[in-house]
Each structure stands twice: as structure tokens, then as C-alpha cells.
Regions:
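Generic non-transmembrane alpha-helical segments
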Residues: 21, 127-142, 183, 219-230
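Alpha-helix C-terminal capping segments
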Residues: 64-68, 84-87, 182-190
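A C-terminal functional module that forms or caps the active site or interfaces directly
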Residues: 154-200
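Proline-aspartate-enriched helix->loop->beta-strand connector
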Residues: 71-75
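N-terminal short beta-loop-beta anion/metal-coordinating cradle
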Residues: 2-63, 69
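Mid-sequence, gly/pro-rich, charge-dense loop/helix-turn segments that line enzyme active sites
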Residues: 83-168
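His/Asp/Glu-rich mid-to-C-terminal helical/loop segments that flank catalytic regions of hydrolases
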Residues: 201-231
């Protein structure tokens, strides 16, 4: 049975290096006003797409990958803003848990990030995370692990950074990972969210993001391909 692997990014810049690194002929399949790139790599069927920015877009694309293409694993590759001093520009981070930091039902005495019949922290795949650590050890890469928070806002202030660390013990912030992990969890599909740091989520984040986006996306893409090689 051919293994089917879904590979996601949020932006075109995040999947361009992925498509180039695999070096196979991809069929382009339009669906839901998006394009899915389908190819065969080392007897594995891989489906690559960028969702566009935000939780709604990434939810749609992840669901499409699972229901329309039948992927059995989902790997997310992209960039994120660092919330802690230990994470520097171009460092790699794998999400052990993810949170929707902009969910606020505190008016009903619910904790931030909580939705009824759900949970605050969304788990990722232990086996895929273990594979990521194995690849990192073999390549002598200092892969970090931690909580990543996701929300429909680009975080660029010291105050918001401090809040996210205090409230969720988060290491990094982005705009898609939690929704990807949530969909995968509900459909029983193993998921790994890998991020390379592009900025420090502070007042200079927009300039840093633009400057380091391409390099950070390359870093994450190369590591992801190494993981696929071992699946």
C-alpha cells in the first residue's frame, strides 16, 4: 500500500523550497480555490499545498488533504515568531502542543484558549515528533520542542509576547498550526508542526519577517524532507 503524506505551508514562500527539494514532477490539482501538488517520491505519494494565511484557510486545506486526497500523515513546514530568548532567528522548533491564543470565552468563565467540548492544548503525534528528534540528532541540529500558539493576528509587541508566555508557556507564535493539528486530531491523522524562527514577535517583527522569511522557510523545508526520507 502506497503511503500518502500531506505537506503543508501557509505561504507560497514556504512550499516553494519543498517542491524544489523533492525534485519530482508534480501534478497540479485545483480544489477549493487552491492548488494541490501531487507527486510520487521514493514510493510515497506526497501532496503539497500552501493554505494561505490564517486558521480558517489552514483548516480548509488540511481537511481537503485528508478527505479528498486521503493523506495518512500531515507535516506542516513554515516560519514562526520566537517568544523566548532561547529561540533565535533560523532555529528549528517542533510543536509538542498547540493552542488557539485568540479564543476568548472568559465572559462565560472559561479559560483563554478553551472551547466547550474541546481542550486548550492540542496534541501532535508523538511518533512523528520522535522522528523529528532522531533526524535532528543524526544531523547535529539543535531542534527545540515546545508549545506553539496560533491566532489570526501577526504578533509584534513585547506586551503580547509576555502575555502568551505567561498564559500558555508558549515558545513561538504563528497563525495556522493549531488549526492544522486540531483537524488532524479529529480525523485521527498523525500530525507534526515544524517551524523555523523568522522574527522575535516584537516591534521590529515585520521587518525581520520579510528579511528572514526565505532563509527560514528553506531551513524548515530541508528538515522536513529529511523526515519524509525516513517515513
Amino acid at each position: 500500500m502506497v503511503q500518502k503524506i500531506g505537506i503543508l505551508g501557509a505561504m507560497r514562500e514556504e512550499i516553494t523550497p519543498i517542491l524544489e527539494l523533492f525534485g519530482v514532477d508534480f501534478e497540479e490539482i485545483p480544489l477549493g480555490e487552491n492548488v494541490f501538488h501531487k507527486g510520487v517520491y521514493r514510493n510515497k505519494e506526497i501532496i503539497v499545498a500552501y493554505s494561505k494565511i490564517g486558521k480558517v484557510h489552514s483548516t480548509l486545506t488540511t481537511t481537503s488533504m485528508i478527505l479528498a486526497f486521503g493523506v495518512q500523515k500531515v507535516l506542516f513546514s513554515g516560519v514562526a515568531g520566537s517568544l523566548i530568548k532561547d529561540l533565535k532567528i533560523n532555529d528549528l522548533l517542533v510543536a509538542i502542543q498547540l493552542v488557539q491564543h485568540d479564543v476568548d470565552l472568559s465572559a462565560f468563565n472559561h479559560p483563554l484558549g478553551f472551547i466547550p467540548e474541546s481542550a486548550i492544548f492540542i496534541e501532535t503525534s508523538e511518533s512523528l515528533n520522535a522522528l523529528a528528534k532522531k533526524v535532528a540528532n543524526e544531523q547535529h541540529i539543535a531542534l527545540k520542542e515546545g508549545v506553539i500558539v496560533s491566532g489570526d493576528q501577526f504578533v509584534h509587541s513585547k506586551e503580547r509576547k509576555e502575555f502568551l508566555v505567561s498564559e500558555f508557556k508558549a515558545s513561538a507564535v504563528e497563525m495556522e498550526g493549531a488549526s492544522v493539528a486540531f483537524v488532524c486530531q479529529k480525523f485521527g491523522v498523525p500530525c507534526c508542526v515544524l517551524r523555523s524562527i523568522s522574527d522575535n514577535a516584537d516591534e521590529e517583527a515585520n521587518m525581520s519577517f520579510d528579511a528572514f522569511l526565505e532563509k527560514s522557510a528553506q531551513t524548515s523545508a530541508k528538515f522536513l524532507k529529511s523526515m519524509v526520507d525516513k517515513l
